[in-house]
Amino acid sequence: MSDDYRETDPTRQPEDMGEGSLRPETLADFTGQKASRENLAIFIEAARARNEALDHVLLHGPPGLGKTTLAQIVARELGVGFRATSGPVIQRAGDLAAILTNLQPRDVLFIDEIHRLQPAIEEVLYPAMEDFQLDLIIGEGPAARSVRIDLAPFTLVAATTRAGLLATPLRDRFGIPLRLVFYTPEELRAIVSRGALKLGMRLTDDGAEEIARRSRGTPRIAGRLLRRVRDFALVSKHAVVDRALADAALGRLEVDERGLDAMDRRYLKRIAEHHHGGPVGVETLAAGLAEARDTLEDVIEPYLIQEGLVLRTARGRMLGEAGWRHLGLTPPASQVDLLSSLEQDDSAP
């Protein structure tokens, strides 16, 4: 079994042991995702009142929005053990069986990237999730026999950026599906301000606002930018980080006012300059940018589409009006007509 499987005490996670994690540790400390957070609090309280394992939870949405953090918080709030692994490292049914049989009653098992589980391993997971039982084949050929193993009741918390890739039988076994969405600038400003306190930084309100505004609606990016701005402040001997210093540091990092980095701008320019604004297939874009298709779909595109900079159509990707404006370019007449026709299609009943 892979060494990437981890057992942890929910009150002391590996991320807490360094310089000071920026992760919140309780639902009360968790900023954003209001509806999902409030519903999860109710489900956790109900499970504790019944002294039962919480129903299985599926967390899906773009990367960096707090899926792993929420999984850890669920274990803390329930007061149970937390076990973590990921889909790609579970190579055999025996690996999964070893993990499941070592769980204590009501423990939380976190599987990241669950969409990358092999189909044969998914089949083993079905009875484990539904009946807390494992059906394993022991031996080979005529001597093979089926063995059923009873498991302690547990909660599977799974995370994925590609919920559509999950097999329907697997997806349907999650009683609590929660979609995480991009954070508002106000939520990110609160996250950045709290992170600055944990890092011992003196950060002005407008400095926090500047970092939040360029964080693409994503706490993970906000935390990364906050740490890099701190580095610039330290080396330049600034005791206080204000908007001007944050702006200068983020400019050095090539993060523009909308939070787009050099790769995002390459993506937009590729569509504009090489494909006349699109539509263009994602495979063609991936080849032209020398990036994996998954990188475009999971990392680059979600925020660009959310902001209207890019449109995803049946014929491929197109630059939206906001994308042309961001590049400081004027769309050709053919693109203006095409964008107008798409708007009319969207407004049709």
Curated annotation (Swiss-Prot):
Belongs to the RuvB family. Residues 1-183 are annotated as: Large ATPase domain (RuvB-L). Residues 1-25 are annotated as: Disordered. Has 3 domains, the large (RuvB-L) and small ATPase (RuvB-S) domains and the C-terminal head (RuvB-H) domain. The head domain binds DNA, while the ATPase domains jointly bind ATP, ADP or are empty depending on the state of the subunit in the translocation cycle. During a single DNA translocation step the structure of each domain remains the same, but their relative positions change. Residues 257-349 are annotated as: Head domain (RuvB-H). This is Holliday junction branch migration complex subunit RuvB. Homohexamer. Forms an RuvA(8)-RuvB(12)-Holliday junction (HJ) complex. HJ DNA is sandwiched between 2 RuvA tetramers; dsDNA enters through RuvA and exits via RuvB. An RuvB hexamer assembles on each DNA strand where it exits the tetramer. Each RuvB hexamer is contacted by two RuvA subunits (via domain III) on 2 adjacent RuvB subunits; this complex drives branch migration. In the full resolvosome a probable DNA-RuvA(4)-RuvB(12)-RuvC(2) complex forms which resolves the HJ. GO terms for biological process: DNA recombination; DNA repair. It holds the Pfam family AAA_lid_4. It is found in: Cytoplasm. SMART domains: AAA. ATP binds at residues 22-23, 64, 67-69, 130-132, 173, 183, 220. It is an enzyme of class 3 (hydrolase). The RuvA-RuvB-RuvC complex processes Holliday junction (HJ) DNA during genetic recombination and DNA repair, while the RuvA-RuvB complex plays an important role in the rescue of blocked DNA replication forks via replication fork reversal (RFR). RuvA specifically binds to HJ cruciform DNA, conferring on it an open structure. The RuvB hexamer acts as an ATP-dependent pump, pulling dsDNA into and through the RuvAB complex. RuvB forms 2 homohexamers on either side of HJ DNA bound by 1 or 2 RuvA tetramers; 4 subunits per hexamer contact DNA at a time. One of its GO terms (molecular function) is four-way junction DNA binding. GO terms for cellular component: cytoplasm; Holliday junction resolvase complex. Residues 1-15 have a biased composition (Basic and acidic residues). Its main location: cytoplasm. Keywords: ATP-binding, Cytoplasm, DNA damage, DNA recombination, DNA repair, DNA-binding, Hydrolase, Nucleotide-binding. It catalyses: ATP + H2O = ADP + phosphate + H(+). DNA binds at residues 293, 312, 317. The keyword DNA-binding applies. Its EC number is 3.6.4.-. Residues 184-254 are annotated as: Small ATPAse domain (RuvB-S). The lineage of its organism: Bacteria, Pseudomonadati, Pseudomonadota, Alphaproteobacteria, Acetobacterales. It comes from Gluconobacter oxydans (strain 621H) (Gluconobacter suboxydans). Mg(2+) binds at residue 68.
